[in-house]
């Protein structure tokens, strides 16, 4: 406990690479990277994006995150297949894949039970009550979903626009009372494409 780790944005689609990911990696304890998905419901494109992501990693951390929150196709099964294809490439290359999105977007666009059946405890879910500065979680909007590893509880955890997240699964516990006793946080900058950094304080 007491460590300061990071999850850093590296790529988006197959045409954008963060110009600051290497610098952010060198000045932090990076435990993961994430990719903003543009593949919708296309398996081949998802695989290409995963390979592009992996080929541009500044280091080899534990987690690789598929940020799936925009551009889903109208075919829920196709979207699910594409997400799994992306995660499969990450897994095949020795990483632990994580799925990031919002609960309503997830339920509307993918069969999340298929994702968690293959990759248990792999969800990073965003849900917050407003856009006010909230340094502490408001449990009234906790997105109750099985297999949630991280919960993003605000987009403005600090003035200046930083996300904050609670690590739900990290010590083998998944009960609210125990979560609050071992509260760990992720902070992710949202100041444009160049500023995406996640910081986890505590056990992951």
PLM segments and residue spans:
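Generic detector of solvent-exposed, compositionally biased contiguous segments
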Residues: 61, 96-97, 177-185
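Substrate-binding cleft of extracellular glycoside hydrolase catalytic domains
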Residues: 1-99
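Short, solvent-exposed loop/turn elements at domain surfaces
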Residues: 15, 158-162, 196
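Residue-level detector of flexible, active-site-proximal loop/helix-junction positions
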Residues: 40, 72, 104, 132, ...
């Amino acid at each position: 406990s007491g460590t300061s780790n990071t999850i850093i944005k590296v790529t988006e689609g197959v045409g954008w690479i963060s110009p600051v990911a290497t610098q952010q990696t060198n000045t932090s304890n990076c435990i993961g990277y994430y990719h903003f998905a543009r593949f919708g419901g296309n398996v081949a494109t998802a695989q290409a994006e995963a390979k592009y992501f992996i080929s541009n990693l500044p280091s080899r951390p534990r987690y690789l995150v598929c940020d799936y929150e925009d551009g889903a196709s109208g075919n829920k099964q196709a979207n699910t297949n594409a997400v799994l294809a992306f995660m499969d490439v990450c897994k095949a290359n020795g990483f632990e894949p994580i799925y990031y999105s919002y609960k309503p977007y997830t339920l509307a666009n993918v069969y999340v039970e298929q994702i968690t059946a293959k990759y248990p405890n792999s969800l990073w879910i965003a849900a917050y009550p407003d856009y006010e500065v909230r340094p502490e979680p408001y449990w009234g909007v906790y997105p109750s979903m099985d297999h949630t590893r991280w919960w993003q509880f605000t987009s403005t955890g600090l003035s200046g626009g930083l996300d904050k997240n609670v690590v739900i699964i990290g010590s083998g516990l998944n009960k609210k009372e125990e979560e609050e006793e071992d509260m760990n946080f992720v902070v992710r900058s949202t100041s444009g494409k160049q500023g995406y950094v996640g910081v986890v304080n505590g056990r992951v």
